Design a protein with these regions (language model features):
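Phosphate-group recognition and catalysis centered on beta-loop-alpha active-site segments
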Residues: 1-74
């Protein structure tokens, strides 16, 4: 069975698409589904229009740390 978290494994709404939620998801062996947007030439993780304080797609890949987990991107 494949388990995907939605915007990371968050415990409060403020954690959605934040580093802590992605670390929690990946550390438990869950993949994740999230959204990518572009702002000022960078790809960032954001469900809504980016505000400039989002983590970058590159940072998300660093959090994955080479783990072979599903990553569903919209």
């Amino acid at each position: 069975m494949i388990i995907l978290s939605h915007r990371g494994y968050w415990k409060s709404e403020e954690e959605r698409n934040q580093e802590v939620a992605f670390h929690r998801s990946f550390d438990l062996g869950y993949g994740t589904e999230t959204d990518i947007r572009d702002i000022q030439g960078k790809l960032v993780i954001s469900h809504d229009m980016p505000q400039g304080n989002e983590i970058t797609f590159e940072e998300l890949l660093q959090i994955m740390d080479g783990r072979n987990l599903p990553l569903a991107l919209n």
